[in-house]
Amino acid sequence: MSITKNDKNTRTTGRPTLNEVARRAGVSPITASRALRGVASVAEELAQKVRDAARELGYVANPAARALASAQSHSVAVLVPSLANLLFIETLEAIHAVLRPQGLEVLIGNFHYSRNEEEDLIRNYLAYQPRGLLLTGFERTESARRMIEASGIPCVYMMDLDSGSGLNCVGFSQLRAGEAAAEHLLARGRRRLAYIGAQLDQRTLLRGEGFRRALQKAGCYDPGLEILTPRPSSVALGGELFVQLLASQPQVDGVFFCNDDLAQGALLEALRRGVKVPEQIAVLGFNDLPGSDCTVPRLSSIRTPREAIGRRAAEQLLALIAGKEVRDSALDMGFELMAREST
């Protein structure tokens, strides 16, 4: 087979082209492109023919070429603070399930709870002109805020609420969730209540503030019953901090952890040391992560709508990309207190 540079429908290198895939599948290059991107308007039978042709030829899409051809990428950038936490994995799965059928690639950035790292990721992603941004919370550097605003790219904020800002956001009130935690423990007759928080991102601090306010209102707040550490949340850390709390405050009768993994660690340590839960001390977690209903005793926790937040945030972003008006810019997904055996 002879190959010439003047024939744009043949390749000039050994790399298969989209045009070759289209010819083999018997469709136009545009249809082939849409099929490979998973656009829902392409019939499944036709899309399968295109995928088969691409596989037979060893074709791999070139995102840079696609972006140059359309003057805009087909991607959405999603930034989360951690991929080690199931909280964000469930949210990302929901986002992908909404965006992928629309032919949008999901670019995931993990900024490890670092504002500077998030700023770098935002700068890098904006250079590729994504169709939209999905960001976690409102806490970031001023430089990052300016870049987002100047880009003009649709953006939706997840996990937190700020109805007064006019920003598009999907989440729940972290402050109110903290208050609900305190109210639950108070209703169980507990008065010596502790709060243990790790990582110390804005959401953790807001939960603690809500917890503190409710205790102050009840007249039983003790600042000596707060343990806060910037260390990453984990089961092992939960056990360690629980032991620290019992050693320094033996009269404590209830504790609220900022995340379930910490609370799960506390339950394991209580079992190891013969501390009776909830008879001696009530233990309450947050997020209701998988496994919390299988601990001994079963962990009480505040369930957060992680899947729903991801899904609705992605849907809101699609509406913004399409130029539609979003009436409820601040969408409160609420939370649910799961009262189990540990309280």
Swiss-Prot record:
Residues 18-37 bind DNA. The keyword Translocase does not apply. Keywords: DNA-binding, Repressor, Transcription, Transcription regulation. InterPro entries: HTH_LacI (IPR000843), LacI/GalR-like_sensor (IPR046335), Lambda_DNA-bd_dom_sf (IPR010982), Peripla_BP_I (IPR028082). Induction: Negatively autoregulated. Residues 16-70 form the HTH lacI-type domain. GO terms for molecular function: DNA-binding transcription factor activity; transcription cis-regulatory region binding. Gene3D superfamilies: 3.40.50.2300, lambda repressor-like DNA-binding domains (1.10.260.40). It comes from the Bacteria. SMART domains: HTH_LACI. GO terms for biological process: regulation of DNA-templated transcription; regulation of glucose metabolic process. Free GntR fails to recognize gluconate and 6-phosphogluconate, whereas the GntR/DNA complexes recognize both ligands. It is therefore likely that GntR DNA binding induces structural changes that permit GntR to recognize effectors. Involved in the regulation of glucose metabolism. Represses its own expression as well as that of the gluconate permease GntP. It employs an effector mediated de-repression mechanism: in the absence of ligand, GntR binds to the gntR and gntP promoters and represses their expression. The release of promoter bound GntR is induced by gluconate and 6-phosphogluconate that bind with similar apparent affinities to the GntR/DNA complex. The release of GntR leads to transcription of the genes. This is HTH-type transcriptional regulator GntR. The gene is gntR.
